[in-house]
Amino acid sequence: MAKFVPAIFLDRDGTINVDHGYVHEIDAFEFIDGVIDAMRELKKMGYALVVVTNQSGIARGKFTEAQFETLTEWMDWSLADRDVDLDGIYYCPHHPQGSIEEFRQVCDCRKPHPGMLISARDFLHIDMAASYMVGDKLEDMQAAAAANVGTKVLVRTGKPVTAEAENAADWVLNSLADLPSAIKKQQK
């Protein structure tokens, strides 16, 4: 029987990197201060790290899937060079009003739907109750709730925090950089 592992599900734009809007080029990708160290610490604490990101810019024709994949590969290698190995990267290229027909659809992977988290759970054998979802928007919290993620963490490094998002979260932190110490404090 497979051993189940706890995970940190991570939104990308506004959580891992500064959200400049439809980030798809290496030059525009800027890691938020402290997140790489935090991710390294979370790995040491025994968590799988799984990126779950809506990328509607693909459906909207702002950038191609190939451009997204090139940037994602660069991000993955940049993190690996700093001793942060991601366990999974899941993305949704769809949008119901997309201008690119192949990606114009209602799907179950676009947050607030839980599809990406469920796929990761099944593939990586994740213990959802012991896991955390970290994101900057209400949709991240809703996806986590729908997937039965144990702790929903809203961060202030992305979109302005709304009261609705705050109410949907279990924790509100200034940044992903603060998560390792928050988890340690809670586990005492």
Swiss-Prot record:
Cofactor(s) this protein requires: Mg(2+); Zn(2+)
Broadest EC class assigned to this enzyme: hydrolase
Binding site for Zn(2+): C92, H94, C107, C109
Sites annotated Stabilizes the phosphoryl group: T53, K111
Keywords: Carbohydrate metabolism, Cytoplasm, Hydrolase, Lipopolysaccharide biosynthesis, Magnesium, Metal-binding, Zinc
InterPro entries named among the record's database cross-references: HAD-like_sf, HAD-SF_hydro_IIIA, HAD_sf, Heptose_bisP_phosphatase, Histidinol-phos
Record-annotated active site: D11 (nucleophile), D13 (proton donor)
Binding site for substrate: D11, R12, D13, D19, H20, G21, Y22, T53, N54, Q55, S56, R110, K111, K137
BP terms from Gene Ontology: ADP-L-glycero-beta-D-manno-heptose biosynthetic process; lipopolysaccharide core region biosynthetic process
Catalysed reaction, written as an equation: D-glycero-beta-D-manno-heptose 1,7-bisphosphate + H2O = D-glycero-beta-D-manno-heptose 1-phosphate + phosphate
GO CC list: cytoplasm
Subunit structure: Monomer.
Family affiliation: Belongs to the GmhB family.
Record's protein name: D-glycero-beta-D-manno-heptose-1,7-bisphosphate 7-phosphatase
Species this protein is from: Salmonella typhimurium (strain LT2 / SGSC1412 / ATCC 700720)
This protein's encoding gene: gmhB
